[in-house]
């Protein structure tokens, strides 16, 4: 019997062989980042430690202005959360992201709707601040909104081109933010946060 030379048949056979033999074949994900609710990029091979594709759409609201960004890339499965995360880092600084995690080639080529921002105060409060080039920050109490019921404190560095400045943030967050652990790489839509420290507590 002759083997098919069709590329799609060969690819399927290759994937099946990897699965059956436990070879751990590398994952291929679409890679891109752009302003707006869509981005399109090339398929690239993920590094051996990144076994998941991620699609993330983030919306930041600051001083009445809204910015939407989309991110697609490779990520470690333990760093990826499928769902919505909402944070408030000040009275006029809100961020909400919607993410989709998957583990097959090109699975993050889909489309996600821009998440809705719920700015309705829920009666809870947390200390809030943001700071660059620091590991800690202090700030006044701010009102939590929507389903935000935890106070979060986090620090690390930002992957911003060749620069990796430190940052610190505190504020309100949904419980989904608390699944993130130190050492995680967290895409936000515009860049990637490398977390050194994160602490979540129930809002008083």
UniProtKB/Swiss-Prot annotation:
Subcellular location per UniProt equals: Secreted
Cystines in this chain: 29-53, 32-39, 46-74, 80-101, 102-107, 126-151, 144-172
Q: Does the keyword DNA repair apply?
A: no
Q: Which Pfam families match?
A: PLA2_inh, UPAR_LY6
Q: Which GO terms describe its cellular component?
A: extracellular region
Concerning SUPFAM superfamilies, the annotation shows: Snake toxin-like
Q: Which domain of life is it from?
A: Eukaryota
Keyword field contains Protease = no
* InterPro entries associated with the record: CNF-like_PLA2_Inhibitor, LY6_UPA_recep-like, PLipase_A2_inh_N, Snake_toxin-like_sf
GO MF annotation list: phospholipase inhibitor activity
State the signal peptide span.
1-26
Tell me, in one coarse class, where this protein mainly resides. secreted
Q: Which UniProt keywords apply?
A: Disulfide bond, Secreted, Signal
> Into which family does the record put it?
Belongs to the CNF-like-inhibitor family.
The cross-references to PANTHER family, in alphabetical order and at most eight, read: LY6/PLAUR DOMAIN-CONTAINING PROTEIN 8, PHOSPHOLIPASE A2 INHIBITOR AND LY6_PLAUR DOMAIN-CONTAINING PROTEIN
- What this protein is called in its record is phospholipase A2 inhibitor and Ly6/PLAUR domain-containing protein
Organism of derivation: Homo sapiens (Human)
């Amino acid at each position: 019997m002759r083997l098919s030379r069709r590329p799609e048949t060969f690819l399927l056979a290759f994937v099946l062989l990897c699965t059956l033999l436990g070879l751990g074949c590398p994952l291929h994900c679409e890679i891109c980042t752009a302003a707006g609710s869509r981005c399109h990029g090339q398929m690239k091979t993920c590094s051996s430690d990144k076994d998941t594709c991620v699609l993330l759409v983030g919306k930041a609201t600051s001083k009445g202005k809204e910015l939407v960004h989309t991110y697609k890339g490779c990520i470690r499965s333990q760093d990826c959360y499928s769902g919505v995360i909402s944070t408030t880092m000040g009275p006029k600084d809100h961020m909400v992201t919607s993410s989709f995690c998957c583990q097959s080639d090109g699975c993050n080529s889909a489309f996600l709707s821009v998440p809705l921002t719920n700015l309705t105060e829920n009666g809870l409060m947390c200390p809030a601040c943001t700071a660059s080039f620091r590991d800690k920050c202090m700030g006044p109490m701010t009102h939590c909104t929507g389903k935000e019921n935890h106070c979060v404190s986090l620090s690390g560095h930002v992957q911003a081109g060749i620069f990796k400045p430190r940052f610190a943030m505190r504020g309100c967050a949904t419980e989904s933010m608390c699944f993130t652990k130190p050492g995680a790489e967290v895409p936000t839509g515009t860049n990637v946060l490398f977390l050194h420290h994160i602490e979540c507590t129930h809002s008083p």
